[in-house]
Every structure is written in structure tokens, then in C-alpha cells.
Amino acid sequence: MSSILPFTPPIVKRLLGWKKGEQNGQEEKWCEKAVKSLVKKLKKTGQLDELEKAITTQNINTKCITIPRSLDGRLQVSHRKGLPHVIYCRLWRWPDLHSHHELRAMEMCEYAFNMKKDEVCVNPYHYQRVETPVLPPVLVPRHTEIPAEFPPLDDYSHSIPENTNFPAGIEPQSNYIPETPPPGYLSEDGETSDHQMNPSMDAGSPNLSPNPMSPAHNNLDLQPVTYCEPAFWCSISYYELNQRVGETFHASQPSMTVDGFTDPSNSERFCLGLLSNVNRNAAVELTRRHIGRGVRLYYIGGEVFAECLSDSAIFVQSPNCNQRYGWHPATVCKIPPGCNLKIFNNQEFAALLAQSVNQGFEAVYQLTRMCTIRMSFVKGWGAEYRRQTVTSTPCWIELHLNGPLQWLDKVLTQMGSPSIRCSSVS
């Protein structure tokens, strides 16, 4: 705490003494400014004692500690902006917090961020981390009729997909409304985040509830097949037109970006700017210049989100997302700059898998396609665009979701699949 200046008020020093994690000099100074900013606001409203009580007792039964909501919902400290509840939860509880997606308000919080009131609660003990739900094992009967070979997957890559815009046209198949920020909310680095007018389908919806085993299966030997979280939650391949470029990126971090810059890639960034291609044409070159900050991918609580950080839209083809909204499986959704879309949900997939087991080997194998997500930068494809297939777009990526794919492999093996490996490339 050596960086604290001599005139730092005692209350600020005490509150900083409770912060979590180790920070470097610059970060420590920023934390001090964030606490000073909050102390100044709370002095005016007489809530300072309640803040100190909440931080020192770590008690969820303390009162809401509120500050006025700004127009865009963010709080500026020095030259950085962020959502206030995320800033103070990170400072006093979870230094590894990446995003507001990872937080859920406690029931007794009257001014929770998602309530969209004029005041927002920043009591760190009025929020909890979103936990990844435990997926129930799939009960799999061993079939006696084994297919001689894998059935052909429904392949939409060469068909002309329908198009939809985000958030227009997003009508869920149930009345479940998730806790999401209102339109216009911005993420911490200055991009509009989670305009999610895309309520996800309730896991209890009739369309997604796992069916009980049919009577024909009652006397069969049922084996539970469990979901295991892999070390790398997804693998990302980059393409220019129909040619794959560079090595596959394996994502291990819950939040990572794919961008157009030339920095060396690391566990949290896949930088496309450094990748070379002798066959690259002028259209691809031009598109690459507009990728910019690209897309941020989150894997939190068993859900995958894509947030467009670029100044140009991204275009996403996610069969899981399309099923949620009742669209054709090949529909391509345009995500404008700053918007955020849930592109995969493990619980929905688990329910579909449990249903498909009752329908036989082929129905389960068809779910392989659902574990692949395609995403193009700047230029879209589909019926409303000049480019009608993803391989006609200058720059695009393909995500393989490793956890669901490996789960499918295990289920198919238990069902008595052929000895060859079933995967997204089988």
C-alpha cells in the first residue's frame, strides 16, 4: 500500500485494506481512485458507514449501497469506464472477475443492476458469482442394431441460409426473461454490452425438457454418461474464403478475443493480423483491415456469448441459438457493433441430447452439427447478401465446442457406434 499518498483519508485506507488480489503500481493507484470516488459519493448520502460495515463483516444482510445510475450505466474512474457493481465486486471480492455475465444479484437486493432503477447497488455482498450448472448424466441404452457407417450430417454450408438482424426479430419461444442490462448498457472497455433482447428459452420449456425413456427402453441396460469440462472449452479455426489460414487456436480462458491486430496471440487473444496467406486477394486484405477489435467470446455458467467489439458487424450461424428462437438451423444472425448474443447453452444442449437418445443413433449424431458455430467479420452471407455461403466471405472463423462434442462421442460410443471416432470432422 506504499503508493497511497499521505493525504489519503483514513476511511479510504481502511477500505483499501480489504481489497482482494495483488495489483501492480498503476492498478493499485486506480483502485485507490475508485475507492475515493465511491467514498465521495457515499458521504453525500450518508451510506459510508454501511459500506464499511458490509466490507468488514462480509455480511449479505447489510443494506443496499447505492449510487446514481449514469446515462450509459457506467462509472468513469480516471480514464477507464466500467459497470459500477463489477468494479467494486472485483475490488473487494473477486479480482478475477471478467464481466457482468458472471454476477447475479441476491434476492433481497432492492437496487440490483438488472432492475434498471435510477440508483444501482454497489454492495459487493449483494451479488454472487454465477456457478456453472451441473448437467445431469444422459441415460443411454446399448442398441443392438449398429449402423454400418455414420449417417450423413445435415450440411447447410452449401445451402443459402436465411438472415435475421439482432436484436430485431428475436422472439423467444417462452415468456422467460433473463436478468439482462437494459439497451444501451456498455461493457467495461467502452463497448455496448449485452443488449440482450434475446431472452433465452426456459430450461423448463416443453420443447426442451428431457423425455423419460420410452417403454421400449425400460428393460434395457441404461448407462449414465456424464459431461466433463475439457481443458480447452473451444477450438477456433480461421478461414479466408474457402482456405484455412494458420493454426487452430485452443481457448482455455473464460473470456477471450479474436481480433485483427498483429500482437502475438496468448491464452486470452487470438490475433489474426499476423497470419499470412500467399493466396490472399484485395477483398480479403480490405476486410482484414476492418476487423479491428473483432469479437469477444465468453464461456460463463455453461453459456457461450459473442460480443461484437469491432466497428463493423459480425455475422453468426449458431444452430443452438437458432433452435432457441425457432429459426431455421442455418439462419445467420447479424450482430451490430457493441451487441452481445448468447450463441450456445449447455443446459439446452443436454436436454436435446437426452431427447435424441430416445430417437436413436442418427438423431444423436445429428447434434454434432449443433456444436459448430460459424462467424464472419465485416461481410455477411445468406439470402439477403451477395455472398450466399460462408466460404464466400473474406474472413471467418469456425468454433468447435469441445465439451459438447466429447460428450456426444461418449454417448455414441455407449450406444454402440462404429469403432471410428465421431467428431465434427467425421
Curated annotation (Swiss-Prot):
Claim: Heme is one of the keywords in the record: no
One of the GO BP terms on file: positive regulation of transcription by RNA polymerase II
Domain of life from the UniProt record: Eukaryota
Entry-linked InterPro entries: Dwarfin, MAD_homology1_Dwarfin-type, MAD_homology_MH1, SMAD-like_dom_sf, SMAD_dom_Dwarfin-type, SMAD_FHA_dom_sf, SMAD_MH1_sf
GO cellular component: cytoplasm; heteromeric SMAD protein complex; nucleus; SMAD protein complex; transcription regulator complex
Keywords: Cytoplasm, DNA-binding, Metal-binding, Nucleus, Phosphoprotein, Transcription, Transcription regulation, Zinc
Any matching Pfam family: MH1
UniProt domain MH2: residue ranges: 233-426
Signal peptide: none
Xref: SUPFAM superfamilies: SMAD MH1 domain, SMAD/FHA domain
Family assignment from sequence similarity: Belongs to the dwarfin/SMAD family.
Assembly mode: Interacts with SARA (SMAD anchor for receptor activation); form trimers with another SMAD3 and the co-SMAD SMAD4.
Domain comment, as recorded: The MH2 domain is sufficient to carry protein nuclear export.
Protein name according to UniProt: Mothers against decapentaplegic homolog 3
Originating species: Gallus gallus
Record gene name: SMAD3
